[in-house]
Regions:
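Short amphipathic alpha-helical segments that mediate assembly, nucleic-acid/protein binding
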Residues: 14-15, 79-82, 106
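Negatively charged, low-complexity tracts enriched in Asp/Glu with abundant Ser/Thr
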Residues: 3-23
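Amphipathic, interaction-prone secondary-structure segments
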Residues: 20-59
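Hydrophobic, Leu/Ile/Phe/Ala-enriched alpha-helical segments that form helix-helix packing faces
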Residues: 18-25, 86-90
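Charged, low-complexity surface segments at secondary-structure and domain boundaries
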Residues: 1-8, 66-72
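Acidic, low-complexity, intrinsically disordered interaction modules
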Residues: 43-90
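Short coil/turn linker and secondary-structure boundary residues
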Residues: 2, 10-13, 77, 91-93
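Mixed-charge, Lys/Arg-enriched low-complexity segments
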Residues: 83-116
Length: 116
């Protein structure tokens, strides 16, 4: 397995970073969003807590791309940049899931999984 962690300070730079690391032979299998609206973006550089994960395969090789500075469920640039990445990856999603807190659980997390 290969882990690629994108830790950009501004969410709008994440799509450029994602484009830079992706390869044409990667097949997207799943996207997971796990964003804590009560805490926000994790301050520590702990990739396992990054709110965005895209899981690709190249043959039998699993590639997990994690992105730190993307947000969901509130106004601002983060959700718009998250939507741009989902569009770039060809993910079908409900815009309300990204731009509103309708999917927010009692623990404050918005958890979304998209299978490809």
């Amino acid at each position: 397995m290969i882990n690629i962690n994108i830790f950009e300070a501004a969410s709008y730079t994440n799509i450029s970073a994602l484009k830079a690391v992706m390869h044409d032979n990667w097949i997207l299998k799943e996207v997971r969003i796990d964003y804590n609206t009560l805490i926000g973006i994790p301050l520590e550089n702990m990739p396992e807590k990054f709110p965005f994960k895209a899981i690709f395969y190249s043959g039998d090789l699993k590639i997990e791309v994690r992105i730190c500075s993307l947000t969901a469920g509130y106004p601002g640039t983060g959700p718009h940049d998250l939507a741009k990445i989902l569009d770039f990856l060809g993910i079908q999603y409900d815009k309300e899931d990204i731009f509103t807190q309708k999917k927010r659980g009692e623990d404050g997390f918005i958890r979304l999984t998209y299978k490809c």
